[in-house]
Amino acid sequence: MANKREFPLAKTRNIGIMAHIDAGKTTTTERILYYTGKIHKIGETHEGDSQMDWMDEEKERGITITSAATTAQWKDYRINIIDTPGHVDFTIEVERSLRVLDGAVTVLDAQAGVEPQTENVWRQAETYGVPRIVFVNKMDKIGADFDKSVKSLHERLNANAQAVQMPIGSADTFEGVIDLINMVADIYDEDKLGSKWDTVPVPDEYKEEAEKRRAALIEAVADVDDNIMEKYLGGEEISNDELKAAIRKATLNLEFFPVYAGSAFKNKGVQMMLDGVIDYLPSPLDVKPYVAHDPKTGDEVELMADDKKPFAALAFKIATDPFVGRLTFIRVYTGSLESGSYVLNASKNSRERVGRLLQMHANSRTEIPEVFSGDIAGAIGLKNTTTGDSLTDPDHPLILESLQVPDPVIQVSVEPKSKADRDKMDVALQKLTEEDPTFRAETNPETGQTLISGMGELHLDIMVERMRREFNVEAKIGEPQVAYRETFTKEAKAQGKFVRQSGGKGQYGDVWIDFTPNEEGKGYEFEDAIVGGVVPREFIPSVDQGLQEAMKNGVLAGYPLIDVKAKLYDGSYHEVDSSEAAFKVAASLALRNAASKAGAVILEPIMKVQVTTPEEYLGDVMGSITARRGTMEGMEDRAGAKIINSFVPLSEMFGYATTLRSSTQGRGTFTMVFDHYSPTPKSIQADIIKKRGGDAE
């Protein structure tokens, strides 16, 4: 028998808490869990016992790395909360959670207002069309300035943000808030850990200011709501319900962002912000239809939350849980799913069985029999599912748009300290790359080194630390490396002759090969132009193979040789002594002999680099790109920032994240992707050859 849905869709909220690092986001989430009855003791991030920060690294560093999903209940609503990291190296976690959320709470530090990472997460939320409310936190701090924080939302983010509350006092004197819609004051009792407050008429000394601010709020709402505008201009009374309905509509349309005040640490204002989540953020029924694609026809299919429709969900996170093993976090868009059922992984076209379904609370869990549309839950038993995969009813396959995964920007070698560590490291890297698509691991066939790449130095530090702690792997970390290549720039004909006579059967292979540069990206091409059997048919594949093997270690510094055409046009053989092995060696000798005449050069990877910076740092940023041998491709404006497009050699990009951070006071960000290979300048080529101990021709 089908299970009954516990909360109606209209009373469900899927929200994220997003902020700059240290704005008090984890503490805010803690308080939400405390006041909604999910935890009985308040944990503090700075004491290392916060409920949401459940990985050991997070507890030590006091920052949130993994977005933990938690279910809470406020009044008669279910709120699914995803706690997201505020550090720029963990942007994928933020992207992931925004992708599956319906609304978000942006937490600001009342002292700092909008900070660099706030700009980044705000831009990401704009990309995914996520409605937001703002919580100005840390009102108890010296220097807290609510009005300045609201102003920073306008100036830095160009957001139509308006206070729906006014703080009573600040720093030591902060004691509560005035509700500008209902025109009442909520004043907290210091002794009750924020669970008790008195709702009283607005104190006389705040009345005039509160009236002024309410008028400003109505004016801001009138700008985005015709009905309110009409009443406002006509001097008619606007009821509280009308005002709330207009704010909700404008917030859902991304035209308005209500701002709240509070101090999570001092237990003030969190409940009113929770009311804001219910009043102004969307239920799964309020969001735009979700667009999926039919894999058979390619047609677009619109998904609206509906339990009766076929099941469709997105796997948005894989975690290795200490108690249940591999855990897949899913967001259900339509339909329902019982534990024990089979689903189709439409992204990989394979059937999988969902063993158990769990509702998550930071790092504890409750088993549930069924999930419904709009739910966020953990699934156990999905062995082949990875981040971004679509899980659907086996008879109704759909591909839900996958996550935008940025490419890693830093790569280092990692070496196990012992043979025993080697096997454990392979298992650890496989698990960690499954969990995090921006973390990659590969073995370099040229050096045998294992290379790991990620979004920044902190990202890789934490991955190495997790290998040590969770998988007991001790490893040494090397310096960042660049994968160079070699190629020919001129035509060259060369002979390769291999003759060996050492008693008994000898060795004989003789070839003439014409080498020419190939088009970029075309790789190696072999042409057989032998006439009259001067090289017998059976030895020709050996010539091709010999060349391919020789090209793995180039002629200048041992880097792979690429984009070369080889035409075998002459040669000779010996009736008895010729063999496949002899022709293989002859081919490699021809390649070596051609090198000096073929204008061999070392190629370096050139990255397409996009830097986003506030305009005031533009000169410094452009100067820094030029100093790194970069070439400018163009510039554009976006959301109050300048975007610079350029091409820069990868070898010059090491340490750039730190340089950019310091030259833009942490407000600049960049992305880079591999674009093409290009010859290195002569002086740099000589340095590379010297370091590798090769011979410059």
Curated annotation (Swiss-Prot):
Q: Does the keyword Nucleotide-binding apply?
A: yes
Q: What is its main location?
A: cytoplasm
Which PROSITE patterns does its entry note?
G_TR_1 (PS00301), G_TR_2 (PS51722)
Identify the residues that bind GTP: 19-26, 83-87, 137-140
Which key words are in the record?
Answer: Cytoplasm, Elongation factor, GTP-binding, Nucleotide-binding, Protein biosynthesis
| InterPro entries on file | EF-G-like_DII, EFG_II, EFG_III, EFG_III/V, EFG_IV, EFG_V, EFG_V-like, G_TR_CS
Query: Which residue intervals define the domain tr-type G in the entry?
Result: 10-285
Query: In the UniProt record, does the keyword Glycosyltransferase occur?
Result: no
Reported function: Catalyzes the GTP-dependent ribosomal translocation step during translation elongation. During this step, the ribosome changes from the pre-translocational (PRE) to the post-translocational (POST) state as the newly formed A-site-bound peptidyl-tRNA and P-site-bound deacylated tRNA move to the P and E sites, respectively. Catalyzes the coordinated movement of the two tRNA molecules, the mRNA and conformational changes in the ribosome.
- Write out the similarity annotation: Belongs to the TRAFAC class translation factor GTPase superfamily. Classic translation factor GTPase family. EF-G/EF-2 subfamily.
Protein name per the record: Elongation factor G
Print the organism lineage.
Bacteria, Bacillati, Bacillota, Bacilli, Lactobacillales
